[in-house]
Amino acid sequence: MATLTQKQNAPKKVFAFRWSGVNRKGQKVSGELQADSINTVKAELRKQGVNVTKVSKKSQGLFSKGGAKIKPMDIAIVSRQITTMLSAGVPLVQSLQIIARSHEKASMRELMGQIAADVETGTPMSEALRRHPRHFDALYCDLVEAGEQSGALETIYDRIATYREKSEALKSKIKKAMFYPAMVILVAIVVTSILLLFVIPQFEDIFKSFGAELPIFTQFVIGISRFMQHWWYVIFGGTAFAIFLYVRAWRASQKVKDNTDKFILTIPVVGMILHKAAMARFARTLSTTFSAGIPLVDALISAAGASGNYVYRTAVMAIRNEVVAGMQINVAMRTVDLFPDMVIQMVMIGEESGAIDDMLSKVATIFEQEVDDLVDGLTSLLEPLIMVVLGVLVGGMVVAMYLPIFKLGDLVG
């Protein structure tokens, strides 16, 4: 019985329908409507005085964005749209319905339509969001719930929108920072492999006709080329298999994830970027949750999860344990030996002045700017580095292949 009731109360899926018909004046009209079924479309149009002649479900084209996957940035944009409409005096349900009708993605229209339907029937916004954990995490829902309880949903949604926008911008910067080193390595591997497998063997055949002893450097390069030709399937197959095993272990084992988090923080430049990004996320999350009225002890749990790294997650949970025991947060931060003195001093000033959320927001802004600067610097550094790496690889092999030709020229001369 409970299962039947649950099914009956489950939110209906919303689809896009194309329709055409005749209005009360006898004029032909057509358009699109979001609804859960063709019957609902016909019923809604009858209320508007339209005699429906044709209704069909709108199909998604091959390159249409309609059925695209919902991304975190979509949620950030929707959060900002809700903030704008609430500040303009539009009721929450109507705001959700407007987004559900107008969004370009069918998946987002369906999601927002379900949330709007739930809220319209009396379900609290936070509870309606909790039914979609893939798109709205616990932190998001907790903040909305805090806004509902305090009667300041508009203010809270403004903070949520800002938080999500900053988080996505930071995530994008981190991806960019990781992308460039990966591209340098990939390009170097591809170029080297092509030269060793296809170009060097051509020269080797030419050198055999010389019948002369080759320079040491040329012999060394040809030896590597022969090794690659005979064992390329083992090299590439073994590498692919090792990557597969690592990815599988990473997904299955928390310990592997934790060790990976520790390792990447030690990588030059990239590790520094990730350190600063983790501190920015910690400060931004703690500022947002604390300013929303969530108790500091609970806010620290959210900040630990949002830090995105095992080292920082463990450190923040250790800070929380000290705070639970009665220690001030700035003193607790000193015990983990991870945060810079500047951060600890700003937190201490915030505690003493009663404006810890403002100070943490400033800390987050500082580190977000530092991440921006580091990523831009890394980009500027790697552009010439790619040229140098390729120049050394290609140039070295070209020299190795032309040394015998120069030597032959000297002998002839």
Curated annotation (Swiss-Prot):
Query: Would the keyword Amino-acid biosynthesis turn up in this protein's UniProt record?
Result: no
Q: Which domain of life is it from?
A: Bacteria
Hey, what's the signal peptide range on this chain? Answer: none
Kindly give the Pfam families that the UniProt entry links to this protein: T2SSF
UniProt GO BP:
protein secretion by the type II secretion system
The cellular location(s) given in this protein's UniProt record come to: Cell inner membrane
Q: Which UniProt keywords apply?
A: Cell inner membrane, Cell membrane, Fimbrium biogenesis, Membrane, Protein transport, Transmembrane, Transmembrane helix, Transport
One GO cellular component assignment for this chain's record is:
plasma membrane
The record's listing under InterPro entries reads: GspF/PilC, T2SS_GspF/T4SS_PilC_CS, T2SS_GspF_dom, T2SS_GspF_sf
> Could you list the residue ranges that cross the membrane?
180-200, 227-247, 286-306, 386-406
Q: What is its main location?
A: membrane
Note the topology in the membrane.
Answer: Multi-pass membrane protein
The keyword Lipid metabolism appears for this protein: no
Q: Identify its protein family.
A: Belongs to the GSP F family.
Function, as annotated, reads: Involved in the translocation of the type IV pilin.
Q: What is this protein called?
A: Type IV pilus assembly protein TapC
Gene (UniProt): tapC
